Every structure is written in structure tokens, then in C-alpha cells.
Amino acid sequence: MNSEMLKQWYKKHNIEQRSINGFWTYLDNWRKEDEDFDFDYGEMDSRLIELDVHKIQFTHLFDYDDFIDVILRIYYNEEHIGSYKSVYTLDGEDEDDILKFEDNRFIKILVETTNNSIEIAEKALKEGIPNQVVEKITGLKSSLIADIKCKIS
């Protein structure tokens, strides 16, 4: 399979959206099933999770069916925290998936720090401090600041 065929396959089977949906399903199920998730990784705010397609790869293993891997990079508040791999058959059927976070101590600190920034942003916006100033103080994205402002208004 050449790269053009792989790109056509990717578009034909709506793989990007299916992989993104698969990530959210996996994460939601993990959060529900693992009572220690928030303790291990902190209370993640889904608004701060971003996904980026990193790789699409055709794989041929002898004595096994060919398959295609799609790797999504996971970012939390613009910091890389892990990857999500979804595996598909050549017919475009879901085969398997796995979510892998990097060092959970780093993620927990990042999540807690970000949550503190969100609390500061909420308080600052309630006091009438302009969005741009809150963005500079907290390091949060302008879209999140606007979302917080709508929530508290």
C-alpha cells in the first residue's frame, strides 16, 4: 500500500473522527471504571485536552493479518501528555486501541497547576479584570478564558 492509497483509505473510512471518538470513549470508560484515575492523574478538565493526528501506519506481520495504526498525540493545556493508538483492519473495522499517558506524576502536577489557574481566572473575572490580563496572569488560552467568563456570568 503506497502513501496515496493510505490517505484515500483514511478519508474513505473517516478514520480521524473515529479515532478521536475512540479516544474520548476510552478515556471516559477509564475514568468511570478506575476509582483511582483522578488520584493518579488529577481531575482533568476535558476542555483542555487536544488531540493531534501524529501517524498513520500500514503494518504487515507475517502469520497475521495486515492492519493500520493511527496514533493521536494527546495534549493537556498545550503540554504533550501521552498518545492514543487505534488499530483498524484494511476493511476499516475497529480492531484494537490503547491509551498511554506519560509520567503520571508530571500529568498530576500539570493538571493541578492548571486547575489552580482556572480558579484564579474565575476569581479575577468575577472582579472585572479584563480577559487579556487574566490570560497573561494564568497562562490559559483566550478561548478558555472566554468560556470561563460565560460560565460565571
Language-model segments: residues:
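N-terminal trafficking/processing presequences and adjacent post-cleavage segments
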Residues: 1-39
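Short acidic DE-rich linear segments
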Residues: 2-4, 110, 150-153
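Charged, amphipathic alpha-helical interaction segments
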Residues: 24-27, 97, 122, 126-129
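Exposed beta-strand-loop-beta-strand "reactive/processing" segments of non-cytosolic proteins
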Residues: 42-86
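Short, positively charged, low-complexity/disordered linker segments
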Residues: 53-59, 112-119
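A short, surface-exposed interaction/processing loop segment used at functional sites
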Residues: 81-113
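Elongated, amphipathic alpha-helical interaction scaffolds
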Residues: 114-153
